Amino acid sequence: MSSGANITYASRKRRKPVQKTVKPIPAEGIKSNPSKRHRDRLNTELDRLASLLPFPQDVINKLDKLSVLRLSVSYLRAKSFFDVALKSTPADRNGGQDQCRAQIRDWQDLQEGEFLLQALNGFVLVVTADALVFYASSTIQDYLGFQQSDVIHQSVYELIHTEDRAEFQRQLHWALNPSQCTDSAQGVDEAHGPPQTAVYYTPDQLPPENASFMERCFRCRLRCLLDNSSGFLAMNFQGRLKYLHGQNKKGKDGALLPPQLALFAIATPLQPPSILEIRTKNFIFRTKHKLDFTPSGCDAKGQLILGYTEVELCTRGSGYQFIHAADMLHCAESHIRMIKTGESGMTVFRLLAKHSRWRWVQSNARLIYRNGRPDYIIATQRPLTDEEGREHLQKRSMSLPFMFATGEAVLYEISSPFSPIMDPLPIRAKSNTSRKDWAPQSTPSKDSFHPSSLMSALIQQDESIYLCPPSSPAPLDSHFLMGSVSKCGSWQDSFAAAGSEAALKHEQIGHAQDVNLALSGGPSELFPDNKNNDLYSIMRNLGIDFEDIRSMQNEEFFRTDSTATGEVDFKDIDITDEILTYVQDSLNNSTLLNSACQQQPVTQHLSCMLQERLQLEQQQQQQLQQPPTQALEPQQQLCQMECPQQDLGQRHTQINGSFASWNPTPPVSFNCPQQELKHYHLFSSLQGTAQEFPYKPEVDGMPYTQNFAPCNQPLLPEHSKSVQLDFPGRDFEPSLHPTTSNLDFVSCLQVPENQSHGINSQSAMVSPQTYYAGAMSMYQCQPGPQHTPVDQTQYSSEIPGSQAFLSKVQSRGVFNETYPSDLSSIGHAAQTTGHLHHLAEARPLPDITPGGFL
């Protein structure tokens, strides 16, 4: 790699074209220099050749002789390529009517191609295998700042960063391995051009053109004249290698070479443009001026953006008539800098468009020399958005002693050099006659100043261009409202007064009204017929009338009077704490406020739970004498209180009850350790106590726990297409004690005839509570004495006692449950923290979902 001092990049070249004038033919008999005649003929042919190039005249005037020859060769090569690629024959271009139609079609295609280039976020680039720019679209100037004529048929390595040249050369090779060129990277860096020895391939050595590995997508940095930070712009190249037809190149032996591969790619900026930049990126226009900045020409884009024709633009006089008064001195400073140095630098100002609209532009003007002397000015303008223009206006250094827009300029010894609209005090006289008498005294005539002076250009401007509302008045209104609101009150006052639209409107304009009243001396000095008042225009845009000002004054008076009398205004009350407290309480109680699903108040639920806790603690000593049904009634009620209501959309048929009326033969108590309950996530509220649940009346002690966590799961899962229910009747015996519980067991469990069980119609299903089917699907049981088996009885819908249950079941779903017939008895086990175990012969109940409380 060579040192950085020897690396050069492409730059803008300032050329001084030779004056092209037709010299008279010398008279006969007068001797002339043969070499001079040869040079004259050569210059004449070059001028004629340059006029045939498809470039604007201002570009052609800057071309030197070598550039004319280079661009001519490039144009002929491009034409040969399209002749072969489009398969156009000379016969297609012959004939009168056919030729006319072909010209119209070509013109339409040309217009469509221009529109496609403008819509494209990037430019088109074609690079040959020897790294020459075969073609570059004209939009390359919008991204890199180079003219199309500056890069065509030049080495592409002059535009590429030194660190990316090797990668670009690798992408040009069809196999991504340019190993044929020795020290190619070093040769590229030092020579800034293609390798000295080019390698040509025959079609047999190259893959098909439509092969997938001929596609290319890579990134590299290109030289950018528009970027003042680094001078390079990261671009993404996406395209493919294709054959470049019609070049008719010859080898060293004179043989015609076959078409070679070239990179056809679209280069787009790596950083996508913002939404605001998309609208203005393709509207760079150029204007031509005299040395005093008088317009003398404008391109088509400038006429489209500004709305003027070239005649309207060039017959107005000084170009400062199209510049905003606040930007005149700023542009004059750049104008002087351009006369001294040849280039003005980036200048941001406002240009006057047609229909009295101001457009922010970023301009760069430079001098064009002819015969060693400045001839004219070429200015390149790029439109900006209003937001960008205001940002540049804020960043502009206030080194100038004054601005025209503020009324502080005292350039000439006159009383007031401004027109009435430029008067810093916008308050006018009341009568029209006094205004007419005053205007001639303060407005100087056009003949008072030099025609090319800034004051003359300012006076020649129409007053209406400063009265016309801007295209986007939202920023002005937002700043105006923000300033007024900040001075009128805090956000609490605005929040309290948000219910009244009129009060809010008065608050927003309070500061502006105070300023207006201070200038005028009172509301009587403000008249709606004063249309030239800037403040009145703003008030009119906001929908504010002078009656609103009087109402505002009355409101201020009454508010001041109430404050003086000691009355407390509701606006002065700080309700922030109350609002935050209410929101916090609402968030804390969000889990208890499911009003759509709950049927009992939260307070009633909590109070009943505490009351039941106290009652159950008092009854622990009396449980030995109580029947099991009476002991289970509070438990059933507590379960109803404890279980929260589920969503109404999840409706399952639930049966609330317990095995209160069933009695195995031996005394059995059921152990329910806390650790095991926590393991199964059934009783999350138990805190380190193991409780026993009674299953028969002979139990000596049967304490139970009051704090139960809800286990909201259905008793029986829903099944389809069957109404048959099989319940196990084995290992269960009827109770020896008469049942007194309000919850009898389901009548479908058929038992001996001496006792019948049915559904209690009075038991309200308050909540979709769940139920343990004997607690046999979750807990394993210790073996105990054998019980008298009861034959399994099948449920039938024909039994009268079961019609109530069947109607309830069929209203929610159809069940088809078959319980295993072998059920072991439950033995009494000591209170322990260990796990319970099933019998080896006991089968689990996978289809029964455990739920509820015992």
Swiss-Prot record:
Renumbered ranges of motif Nuclear export signal: 63-71
GO BP, one annotated term: negative regulation of DNA-templated transcription
Disordered as annotated region, ranges: 1-38, 432-452
Stretch list, region DNA-binding: 37-65
Keywords: Activator, ADP-ribosylation, Biological rhythms, Cell cycle, Cytoplasm, DNA-binding, Nucleus, Receptor, Repeat, Repressor, Transcription, Transcription regulation
GO cellular component: cytoplasm; nuclear aryl hydrocarbon receptor complex; nucleus
Propeptide intervals in chain numbering: 1-9
Protein location: Cytoplasm; Nucleus
Domain note: The PAS 1 domain is essential for dimerization and also required for AHR:ARNT heterodimerization.
Subunit structure: Homodimer. Heterodimer; efficient DNA binding requires dimerization with another bHLH protein. Interacts with ARNT; the heterodimer ARNT:AHR binds to core DNA sequence 5'-TGCGTG-3' within the dioxin response element (DRE) of target gene promoters and activates their transcription. Binds MYBBP1A. Interacts with coactivators including SRC-1, RIP140 and NOCA7, and with the corepressor SMRT. Interacts with NEDD8 and IVNS1ABP. Interacts with BMAL1. Interacts with HSP90AB1. Interacts with TIPARP; leading to mono-ADP-ribosylation of AHR and subsequent inhibition of AHR.
Name of the molecule in the record: Aryl hydrocarbon receptor
Natural source organism: Mus caroli (Ryukyu mouse)
